[in-house]
């Protein structure tokens, strides 16, 4: 009995000691608060950062549209069966991000939020409303559904909250407060050993641009954005990744090859170029420090050609005059362009010759190695040309990729010659007239009159409804 009483007394003593050791909490103790809601309306920050806002707004001056398919009809054939064969304009100012994604024929003409050919993910590089929706709905929630679901929600052009933590004290005090507003971009940077929060100021500057100016694909049932960087960021690394998971963006309707469509891999190509290797960032060349009317320095947000601000960009490193530097860049651009056209010509022939082989009775087993050669050849071509500034960012890498594209196309065409001969086709496979965009689109069976009419009806009826819903909800600038 004495032993039991002693044990009970000992246990109560231990409980009392543990209780006294526990931290005291009160109603006044601080608790973690949820993050401030992301403000997607760029105009809200006009008074806070007037020079930056006004220079960002000036991207509306970059309004000219360049029809890439009209300039190069071969691309219609290379993208047969994919929306890019309908419409592909070269990029213009950030102020047109929403307008252009609404108006492109690639996004179709949906009538309802559940209609249309493309997923929600197609908004992901267009607006700070994307970051707002991810914060509100979670990443999984944001990616669910069709592109049209985001129409009334995503209405503000690419701007402040895409790159800056606009709710932070640092931003309020005039500091950059750079951030990765897309969680999938943060994961991708970590996958290549570049955690954002451990990066230098220069590294972070390029990473915020690299949220969008990258290669990516839509993964899984909900078509979530993912960067294919698990093996690295070179063309062969990403190809290996895609092949391992048997991913293809679409099947070319002529050759039936399972194709990959490169997006805009500026981060990857810049990284292997002379500027990337020397920590010369996107900001240094495209968003230099300039002075306002009062002589105060600020970062110019009218993102554009470095030659437009030569004294504030190139001369920080180069001693040559502007004309000399422009001549060097023009020479590199010409070299890239000439090899690009050669690669395209071989690929176009390969697609039509593959079609001829199918028509002659070729089997899937016979065609499989040929189609993989076509896939790999076009992937290299596309990654080079989709990076619009590769002649400046990494000309050697651009020439290398295009050169290997030619080699892969040659392998495909050599195999096709042999296979066609086995099937009794010994003459040259003639190409249809694809000398213009319109003729090339006709050759792959596109009814452009109907596609354009449906799009115009969408712009006249659905888009005004989106804007009205956004206006009533207070989401518009």
Curated annotation (Swiss-Prot):
Q: Note the SS bond partners.
A: none
Ligand binding (heme c 5): 275, 314, 317-318
| Pathway this chain belongs to | Nitrogen metabolism; nitrate reduction (assimilation)
* Residues annotated as binding Ca(2+): 215-216, 261, 263
Q: What is its main location?
A: periplasm
Give the CC-aspect GO terms: outer membrane-bounded periplasmic space
Name the catalysed reactions.
6 Fe(III)-[cytochrome c] + NH4(+) + 2 H2O = 6 Fe(II)-[cytochrome c] + nitrite + 8 H(+)
Top-level division of the source organism's lineage = Bacteria
Q: Where does heme c 2 bind?
A: 160, 163-164, 301
Q: Which residues bind heme c 3?
A: 94, 209, 212-213
Q: Where does heme bind?
A: 122, 125-126
What does the record give as EC number?
A: 1.7.2.2
Cofactor(s) needed: Ca(2+); heme c
The residues listed in the UniProt record as binding heme c 4, with positions renumbered to this chain, are 282, 285-286, 393
On cofactor binding, the record's note says: Binds 1 Ca(2+) ion per monomer. Binds 5 heme c groups covalently per monomer.
Keyword Cell division included in the entry's annotation: no
MF annotations from Gene Ontology: calcium ion binding; heme binding; iron ion binding; nitrite reductase (cytochrome, ammonia-forming) activity
> Which residues participate in substrate binding?
216, 264
Check the UniProt entry and state the signal peptide residues, or none.
Answer: 1-26
- Give the record's family classification: Belongs to the cytochrome c-552 family.
Name the HAMAP family on file.
Cytochrom_C552
**Function per UniProt:** Catalyzes the reduction of nitrite to ammonia, consuming six electrons in the process.
Protein name per the record? Cytochrome c-552
Organism from which the protein derives: Pectobacterium carotovorum subsp. carotovorum (strain PC1)
What taxonomic classification does the UniProt entry list for its organism? Bacteria, Pseudomonadati, Pseudomonadota, Gammaproteobacteria, Enterobacterales
């Amino acid at each position: 009995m004495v032993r039991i009483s002693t044990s009970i007394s000992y246990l109560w003593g231990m409980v009392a000691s543990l209780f006294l050791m526990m931290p005291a909490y009160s109603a006044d103790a601080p608790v973690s608060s949820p993050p401030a809601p992301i403000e997607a309306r760029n105009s809200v920050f006009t008074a806070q950062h007037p020079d930056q806002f006004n220079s960002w707004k000036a991207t509306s001056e970059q309004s000219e549209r360049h029809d890439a398919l009209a300039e190069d009809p071969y691309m219609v054939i290379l993208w047969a069966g994919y929306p890019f064969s309908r419409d592909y304009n070269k990029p213009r100012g950030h102020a047109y991000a929403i307008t252009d994604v609404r108006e492109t024929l690639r996004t179709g003409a949906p009538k309802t939020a559940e209609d249309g050919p493309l997923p929600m993910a197609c908004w992901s590089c267009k607006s700070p409303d994307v970051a707002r929706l991810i914060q509100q709905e979670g990443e999984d929630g944001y990616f669910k559904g069709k592109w049209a679901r985001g129409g009334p929600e995503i209405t503000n052009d690419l701007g402040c909250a895409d790159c800056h933590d606009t709710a932070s004290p640092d931003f309020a005090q005039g500091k950059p407060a750079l951030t990765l507003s897309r969680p999938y971009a943060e994961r991708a940077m970590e996958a290549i050993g570049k955690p954002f929060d451990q990066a230098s100021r220069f590294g972070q500057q390029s990473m915020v641009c690299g949220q969008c100016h990258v290669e990516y694909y839509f993964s899984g049932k909900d078509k979530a954005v993912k960067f294919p960087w698990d093996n690295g960021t070179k063309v062969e690394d990403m190809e290996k990744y895609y092949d391992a998971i048997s991913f293809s963006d679409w099947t070319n309707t002529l050759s039936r090859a399972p194709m990959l469509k490169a997006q805009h891999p500026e981060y990857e190509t810049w990284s292997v170029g002379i500027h990337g290797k020397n920590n010369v960032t996107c900001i240094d060349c495209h968003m230099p420090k300039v002075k306002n009317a009062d002589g105060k320095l600020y970062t110019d947000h009218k993102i554009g050609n470095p030659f437009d601000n030569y004294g504030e960009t190139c001369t920080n490193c180069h001693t040559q005059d502007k004309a000399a530097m422009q001549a060097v860049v023009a020479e590199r651009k010409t070299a890239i362009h000439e090899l690009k056209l050669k690669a395209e010509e071989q690929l176009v022939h390969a697609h039509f010759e593959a079609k001829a082989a199918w028509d002659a009775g070729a089997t899937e087993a016979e065609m499989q190695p040929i189609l993989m050669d076509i896939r790999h050849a076009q992937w290299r071509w596309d990654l080079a040309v989709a990076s619009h500034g590769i002649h400046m960012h990494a000309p050697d890498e651009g020439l290398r990729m295009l050169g290997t594209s030619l080699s892969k196309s040659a392998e495909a065409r050599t195999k096709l010659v042999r296979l066609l001969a086995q099937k009794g086709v010994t003459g040259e496979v003639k190409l249809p007239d694809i000398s213009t965009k319109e003729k090339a689109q006709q050759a792959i069976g596109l009814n452009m009159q109907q596609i354009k009419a449906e799009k115009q009806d969408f712009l006249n009826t659905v888009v005004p409804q989106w804007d009205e819903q956004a206006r009533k909800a207070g989401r518009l600038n």
